[in-house]
C-alpha cells in the first residue's frame, strides 16, 4: 500500500503540478482545499483535484473560523508588517496548517506537502506550524525540490495537460482570502515598473471610482467591528461588504517592497479595502478609549505580534502571551467611527464611545473650560526638576554640549 501525503491544494499552477510530481514519486495524494473567503469555486477545485488523480479531496469552509480566530486579532492588534502589509497571506497560514494536520491525522498520512517555493516566507510558515502541531509529520515541498523557473513550470503544466489559468504574458502569482489579495511575479518584480491594471481585482483604478463619496458609520464592540450604519453583521460578512464598498472607491491598494524572512527583498502588490477602513477606524476609536500609557505601549506589542505572524510563529508561547495582552486592551474599545470613502481614501471624521476618556470640558478653550490652569505651575516645577538640577550642576545646557 502506498503512503499518503496531504497536499495543500489550491487548484493553481504550483499545487496542480505538485499532484503529478508526488504521484510520480510513488505517493497517494490526499488533496485538501480550504475556503478562507477567497470566493473560489470549490466545486471546480474539487473536480480538478480528482482529475489530477488525487485519491481524495477534502473541501473545508474555514471562513468563519478565519475571521473570528485570526482576522479578529489583526484588527484588535492593528497588525501591519513594516507599517505597510496587513498580513493578508501570513494570517491564513496557521489556520491552513492546522486543518492540514487534522486531515493528515484522520487519513493516516505520513506527511504534508505544500506548493511554496524555496525563496518565499510561506514554506517557513507552513513547516514551522506543522512541527508545532504534530512533530511526527514530514514536510514536503515539491516546488522547492524541483527548482524550476516560473516559465519552466508553465511549460511542464502545458506538456502534461495540466489546466492552469496562467500564461507567459500574465505570469502573476496570486493569493487571496477574506482579508485581502496578494500579487507578485511577472512585471511586478521590477520595483520601478508601475503595476498594470490587470494586477488588481478588488479595487477600482482612481480614474474609475465614483465622483461622490460614501460616508459610513462603523460600530465596534470590544475592538471588533459589528455594524455598518446600524446593520449588524458577522465579522466575515462585514469584511466582504466593506471589501466591495471600499474597493469601489479604490481604497486599499498597497505597493510595498518588503523584507522577507528568508533574507531577500520582494515587491508585492496588495489589495485590502476592508482592512484599510477597519484598521483606520479601530485606531481612531482607540485614541479616545485607551489610556495614554497603554496607547503608547501597545504599538510596541503590535509590531512584535505582526512580526510573529509574518515569521510563521503563530503557534508559540510568545504569540499566546501577546494575544492575551491585546485582548486585555480591548475591553472598552466600543463605539462608533464615521468614515468618508472617496477617491482611494478612507477618512475618519468622527468617533464616539460610551467609554470615551476624552472630556470636552477639559479640552475646550471656551468659558466652559474645567481645566485648572493654575495647577500647571506646580506641575511644571516638578516635571522640570531633573532638568533644573542638571543645569544647576553643569552650568546650564548649551548647543556645544
Swiss-Prot record:
Pathway: Amino-acid biosynthesis; L-arginine biosynthesis; L-arginine from L-ornithine and carbamoyl phosphate: step 2/3. InterPro entries: Arginosuc_syn_C (IPR048268), Arginosuc_syn_N (IPR048267), Arginosuc_synth (IPR001518), Arginosuc_synth_CS (IPR018223), Arginosuc_synth_type_1_subfam (IPR023434), AS_cat/multimer_dom_body (IPR024074), Rossmann-like_a/b/a_fold (IPR014729). It is found in: Cytoplasm. The keyword S-adenosyl-L-methionine does not apply. GO terms for biological process: argininosuccinate metabolic process; L-arginine biosynthetic process; urea cycle. Pfam families: Arginosuc_syn_C, Arginosuc_synth. Keywords: Amino-acid biosynthesis, Arginine biosynthesis, ATP-binding, Cytoplasm, Ligase, Nucleotide-binding. It comes from the Bacteria. Gene3D superfamilies: Argininosuccinate synthetase, chain A, domain 2, HUPs, Single helix bin. One of its GO terms (molecular function) is ATP binding. GO terms for cellular component: cytoplasm. PANTHER family: ARGININOSUCCINATE SYNTHASE (PTHR11587:SF2). This is Argininosuccinate synthase. It comes from Staphylococcus aureus (strain MRSA252). The lineage of its organism: Bacteria, Bacillati, Bacillota, Bacilli, Bacillales.
